[in-house]
């Protein structure tokens, strides 16, 4: 009886020792293997978005070589400068997208059906900044405005997607919000998850948003 108790006690001690040894290995395993994998996945996702924006920009510049561009940082600084003539902001997306969110004070001018109504009475050299989701539709509208005689038009690099990804303000009417219409489930991957609105895919005639 005593021997059996000793055997059982020894077995429990051995199991506890092995479990403790396993736990000692768990920390180094997480640090050496799991954490780098997770970090690598995040880095790959960020780099993938950056490459996606750059690929769209290159393609758009090739198609609309005369269009000028302005970066998100440049526009943000510009809008905070009271000594500088402020640009008219034109949203080149659809009404459905615009209603989800837009840049502050931006006026809708859908690139699929461009109109001169938003720029009526504006001097030809007045600064105008246009934007789409990622830059393509903005460039299309900027190119069209240039053909109508407007000489100071810029397209926002990365569009509202990059603007919102950088935690810059977007609005629904006059109320600050955080979400942006994703255009569709594929292009929406360029939006960070906290910014991507839940919305059905759009059907548009454009090669990119």
Question: What are the roles of these predicted feature ranges?
Answer:
Residues 75, 87-93, 106:
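Short hydrophobic beta-strand that contains or immediately precedes a catalytic carboxylate
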Residues 133-138:
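Membrane-embedded segments
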Residues 91-92, 131, 156:
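Active-site-adjacent beta-strand anchor residues
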């Amino acid at each position: 009886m005593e021997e059996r108790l000793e055997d059982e006690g020894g077995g429990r001690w051995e199991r506890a020792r092995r479990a403790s040894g396993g736990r000692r290995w768990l920390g180094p395993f997480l640090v050496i293997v799991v954490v780098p994998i997770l970090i690598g996945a995040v880095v790959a996702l960020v780099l993938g978005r950056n490459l996606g924006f750059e690929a769209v920009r290159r393609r758009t510049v090739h198609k609309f070589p005369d269009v000028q561009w302005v970066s998100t940082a440049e526009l943000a600084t510009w809008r905070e400068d009271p000594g500088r003539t402020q640009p008219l902001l034109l949203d080149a997306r659809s009404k459905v997208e615009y209603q989800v969110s837009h840049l502050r004070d931006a006026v809708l001018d859908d690139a699929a059906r461009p109109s001169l109504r938003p720029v009526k009475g504006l001097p030809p050299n007045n600064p105008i900044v246009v934007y789409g989701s990622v830059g393509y539709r903005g460039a299309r509208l900027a190119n069209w405005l240039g053909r109508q005689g407007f000489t100071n038009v810029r397209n926002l690099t990365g569009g509202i997607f990059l603007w919102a990804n950088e935690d810059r303000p977007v609005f629904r009417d006059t109320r600050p919000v955080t979400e942006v219409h994703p255009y569709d489930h594929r292009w929406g991957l360029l939006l960070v998850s906290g910014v991507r609105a839940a919305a059905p895919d759009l059907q548009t005639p454009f090669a990119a948003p």
